[in-house]
Amino acid sequence: MGNQMSVPLRPGDQEHDPGADTCKVTSDNECVQNGNPVVLSTRVIQHYEEVDLGISSSKDNVATSSPKTMEAQAVGDASGKNLGKEAKTKAPAARSHFFLTLSRPVPGRPGDQGTDSSAASGRFDVSPSAAPENKDPSEHGALPVAAAPGQAPDKTPGCPEAKQQTLPATGPLAPSPPESQAEAPAQDKDFGFLNRFFKLDKGRESAPVNSQPKEAKGSEDPEQATEAPAVPGNPHGVSAGEDIVDSEQRGQDVDTLSYSVPGDPEVPGTTKEDPQVVDTTENSSSIMSFFKTLVSPNKTETKKDPEDTKATKADSVCDGHAAGQKMSETQAKSKKKRLDSPRLGLSFRKLFRHKDTENSPTTSANLKSDKANFTPQETRGKTKATKSCSPPPPPPEPTSEGRDSGKEKAGPTSLPLGKLFWKKSVKEDTLSTGAEENAVCESPVETVRLEEVESSLQTVDLSEETQPEPTDVKVKEESKPRKTPLMAFLRQMSVRSSEGIPRSEESNVKDSSCQTSNSVEKTPSPPEPEPAGTAQKNKETSSSKDKKSVDKKSATENSKQKNGKQEVREPAPCVQPPTVEANAMQTGDKTPKKSEKRRQSLGGFLKGLGPKRMSDAQVQTDPVSIGPVGKSK
C-alpha cells in the first residue's frame, strides 16, 4: 500500500538520460562485487539496449522490502564476507538472469506492484541497486509499522546476499518474489486492519494495543540500528544529486503515506506510552483505594468490635449465657476477618449487629423466665436447677451450681475468652459472700451432683477461698428460707443413695472422686472445736462407713456377689447422716460456732460419701478410697 504512492514519481525519473541510470547500476554493482567494473561493463551495455528496464528496475527497489527478502538477506549476512569471490565467478549467470527480466513487459509497474510478476522479478534481481533507497529510512527514521519491515533489509551489507541468491538459480527464484511482494501489502493491510480493530476496541482491550506498538517500536529500533551503517556504506559519488533528489521525493511520499495509510499504528504508538502510564497510575490508584477500603473498614470494625464484645460480655456476665454468645462472637470475628470486600463487610456487620440486638433481648427474656422458674425450683429443690444459668446476686444453692456449670462449659469451648470470663465470675463470687457461703454449705449436694455438672474444680477453688473468711458475715447473710432447699437436697441425696447411681454418674465417677479427695483433704484443715452431740455422731457414722467401704473393697476384689449384698445393706446407714445433718442445721443457725460445727459435719459427711459412692458404682480408684480412710482412722 505504501509503495503505490511512491511509484508515480518514477516516470519523472525516466526523463533523466540513461547515462545516469547506468552510473547507478555500475555503482551498485561495484558495491556488490567488491570493485570489479570489468565484468559489469557487459551488463551496462545490455542496459543501454533497453534503458527503460534498467530505469524501472532501479526505481522499483523500494517495493522489494518484503519479509522473504529480509530473511534471505539476513541469512546472507552470516556468510557475507566471502561473497565477493563467488560473485566474480558467477557473473554470466547474472547476465542470463537479466535477459529473463528483459523479455518481460514493463508497463504494468505504475499499477499494482503486488500482482505484477515481471515487476517483482525485476525488483528482486536489481535489489543490490537499492542504494538510493537506503537513505530514505536514515533521513526519515520515524517510519510506521507498514513501511518499517519493507525498507530495512535493502541495506548495503545485504546487496551481495541478494546477488548471491539470484545468480545460481535464475528460474526458481524468479517466481518467488511476487509472493513476497504480495505478502508485503497483505501485511500492511493486516497491520492497518488490526490497528483499526484495536483502535475501536482500545477502550475495551488496552493491553493488546500496548503490546502491538511495542512490536512496532521493536521493529523500528533494529531498522535504525542497521540504517546507521547504511549511510556511510553507500559509495555512490557519481549520482549523488539524483539520489538525494529521489530520496527526498520518496521520503516525502513515504512520510505522507506513513501519516495517511498506516497512521493507525502511529496513533496507538503515540498513545502507547500514555495508556501504560495511565493504566499504571489507575491500577495503582485503584489498588491503593481497594486496600484503603479493605484496611479502613476493618480498622473501624476492630474498633467497634471490642465495644460490641464488651457489651455482649457484660450482658452475658449478667445473664449467665456466656457460652452461646461467646461462640457467636468468635464466629462473627472470624467471619469479619475473612471478609475481603467492604460491601460484604458492611452487610455482615449489619447482620451481626442485628444478631447482637436480637441476642440481648432474648437473654433478658431468659433472665425473666429464669427468675420466674426460680421460685418453684427453690421450693422443690430439684437438681434441674443447674439448667437455669442466670441467678440473681444473692443466689441459693442450685443456681450457684448452675453458674459454675456454665463456667465449666464455657471454659473448654472457648479457652481465651473463657479464661477472661472465669476471672470475672470468680471476682463476682468473691464479692458476693452469700454465694460463697452457699457453695460451702452446698458441698455435700455438689459432690452428689458432680457427675451431672462437672464443676469440681471451681467448687474446690470457692471452698478454698471461703475457708479463711470470717463466719460472722456468713451467719448474718444466711436467711431462714435457705434451710428448706438444703433439707430437700439432703432428702433427695438419701433417696438417690438408696436407689443407686445412674449410668451417667457412673461414667463421671472419676471426676467426682478427685473432687471428693480434694475436698476431704481440705475440709478437716481448720481447727475442730466439735461439740459432743452431732459432730461425734457424724464422725462415728463416717468411720463406720469407711470401714464398711474397706470391707467392700476386699469383697469386690474377691467376688461380685458379696458386693451386691453389701450394696443392699448400705442404704440404711447412709440415710442416717442426712437426718443428723438436718438436726444440726435446725439447731445451729444462731451462733457462728454452730456454723463451724455444720461445716465440719459436712466434711465428715463428705468423707463417708466418697467411698460409699465408689463402692456403689463398682469403680475402684485406690487413692480416693484409701486416703480418706487412713485420715479418718
UniProtKB/Swiss-Prot annotation:
Subunit structure: Homodimer. Interacts with DYNLL1 and DYNLL2.
Residues carrying Phosphothreonine: T330, T523
Record-level Gene Ontology MF annotations: protein homodimerization activity
Segments of this protein annotated with the region Interacts with DYNLL1 AND DYNLL2: 614-633
Region span, Disordered: 1-34, 57-422, 454-633
Annotated function: Required for myelination.
Chief place of localization: cytoplasm
Protein name: Breast carcinoma-amplified sequence 1 homolog
Chain positions found as Phosphoserine: S127, S328, S360, S425, S443, S525, S601, S615
Annotated source species: Mus musculus (Mouse)
Reported phenotype of the disruption mutant: Mice display hypomyelination, schizophrenia-like behavioral abnormalities and a tendency toward reduced anxiety-like behaviors and up-regulation of inflammatory genes in the brain.
Entry keyword set: Cytoplasm, Phosphoprotein
Keyword presence, Cytoplasm: yes
Basic and acidic residues: compositionally biased ranges: 300-318, 400-410, 471-481, 537-555
